[in-house]
Amino acid sequence: MRFKSALGLTVICAVALAVPLRAHHSHGNYVDTFMDITGVVKEVHLVVPHSWVYIEVKDEKGEPQMWALEATGRVGLQKIGVTADYLKPGDTIKARCHHLRDGSNGCLLGFLKDKNGDVKDWDGNNAPPPADF
């Protein structure tokens, strides 16, 4: 009987821990479709577990808006050749990303085109660049 109780408790703990971990890796707060934006790099944070690129984008009225672009972690980006010197403040970049569902200025990066026209998958999927980007 003691074994069944211990096994039951183990299963309950495993399920209780698995749900928050799965939720952390959900992309449910982003829309499913891609959007393209162009802006000027303000900050780059190549960190774990997720890297961030902050860019200034002009809105419909020409007013500058700060956008936060979420990417895979530093280690995943290093594997595709992204280093601390890859993007610099002042660089103009283009991003193909999934916009936040609430409409705020943020997105989950898919592809990023740097100032030299090089395109990389910043979502960690190692996908080939789309032909129309």
Please tell me what each predicted stretch does.
Residues 100-124:
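OB-fold/S1-family single-stranded nucleic acid-binding modules
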Residues 39-41:
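Conserved hydrophobic positions within beta-strands
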Residues 19-23:
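Sec/Tat signal peptide C-region and signal peptidase I cleavage site
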Residues 8-18:
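Bacterial N-terminal signal peptides
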